[in-house]
């Protein structure tokens, strides 16, 4: 791998090859930002819709600063020291009692990504009318009604365009193991990211490589729980998956010194997740990976970088250093957060 110099970047004509300086334990922020800055639907929102919003809240100041940083990084290939953005992050985090982001301490890129998305969502959220129409004719419709009611309850007074990009609905079903006549109960909740466990042992013909699909199967497998005096079967399913799906691989144990470094086998394109969806039009959940956040180290410390896809080429961005990489190296034992975009969605 060779580093891309400023001259080479200028000649290539590829915008998006910009760097962020690490100004003191901010590699996790830089890694997260690079992944979000290469999220096409989020860029489209800022390019076409953000200008109609205005507010004096801390969250809006942060969102505006993110957009200013985004425009600068995409206007030309450059290296930026994001001091003002970091200062605003720390101010907002302190106001929200998120002390982990209010100082120059090493933090989790996955947690920061969700914090930033939630802040941007809060900065432009508004009340909207959400109507639920249609007839309930079968079991799938019963679940659909519960899902839509949950979505309405969560988002009717706090809606933003970011909901349509990052949010979908997860369903938890609970049923009595021994009373076969009892109908299952459903808990439906919106989500903006998924934390997938890494299974310990997966047996299959032809090898024991663990795949991303195996991680989804581990997450959605049946679980026996005791509620009161009764044993119940609990299962997590997805009514839908978002246009932009953010997956965190659960690599850290409660023991801070232990980290799962298992390589997860995963192709970069045409990832079919439809088997985990129980909602309507489930065949439409095919995804491509466009960015990843990598972590090297343990839970007590380490270093974050990002891999991003630009014009069908992959690059590793390590703070202020950019290297072109082979696509076979995008997913590896350091892969921590995976960003996927649904195929066929208008950008």
Task: Walk through the language-model features, giving the residues of each.
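UBL (ubiquitin/ubiquitin-like) substrate-recognition surfaces
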Residues: 1-347
């Amino acid at each position: 791998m060779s580093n891309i110099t400023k001259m080479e970047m200028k000649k290539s004509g590829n915008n998006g090859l910009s760097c962020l300086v690490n100004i003191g334990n901010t590699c996790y922020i830089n890694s997260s930002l690079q992944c979000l800055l290469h999220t096409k639907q989020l860029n489209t929102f800022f390019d076409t819709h953000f200008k109609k919003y205005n507010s004096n809240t801390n969250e809006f100041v942060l969102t505006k600063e993110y957009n200013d940083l985004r425009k600068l990084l995409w206007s030309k290939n450059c290296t930026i020291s994001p001091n003002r953005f970091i200062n605003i992050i720390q101010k907002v985090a302190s106001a929200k009692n998120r002390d982990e982001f209010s100082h120059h301490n090493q933090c989790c890129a996955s947690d920061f990504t969700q914090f930033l998305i939630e802040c941007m969502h809060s900065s432009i959220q508004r009340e909207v009318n959400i109507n639920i129409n249609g007839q309930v004719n079968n079991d799938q419709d019963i679940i659909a009604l519960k899902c839509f009611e949950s979505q309405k309850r969560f988002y009717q007074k706090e809606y933003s365009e970011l909901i349509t990009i990052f949010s979908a609905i997860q369903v938890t079903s609970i049923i009595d193991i021994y009373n076969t006549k009892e109908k299952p109960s459903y808990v439906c909740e919106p989500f903006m990211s998924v934390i997938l466990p890494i299974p310990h042992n997966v047996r299959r013909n032809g090898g024991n490589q663990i795949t991303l699909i195996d991680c989804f199967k581990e997450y959605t497998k049946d679980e026996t729980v005791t509620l009161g005096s009764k044993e119940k079967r609990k299962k997590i399913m997805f009514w839908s998956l978002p246009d932009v799906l953010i997956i965190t691989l659960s690599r850290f144990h409660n023991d801070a010194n232990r980290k799962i470094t298992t390589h997860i086998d995963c192709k970069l394109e045409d990832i079919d997740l439809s088997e985990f969806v129980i909602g309507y039009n489930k065949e439409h959940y095919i995804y491509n990976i466009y960015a990843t956040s990598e972590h090297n180290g343990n839970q007590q410390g380490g270093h974050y970088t990002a891999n991003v896809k630009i014009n069908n080429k992959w690059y590793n961005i390590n703070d202020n250093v950019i290297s072109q990489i082979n696509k076979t190296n995008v997913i590896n034992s350091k892969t921590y957060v995976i960003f996927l975009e649904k195929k066929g969605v208008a950008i």
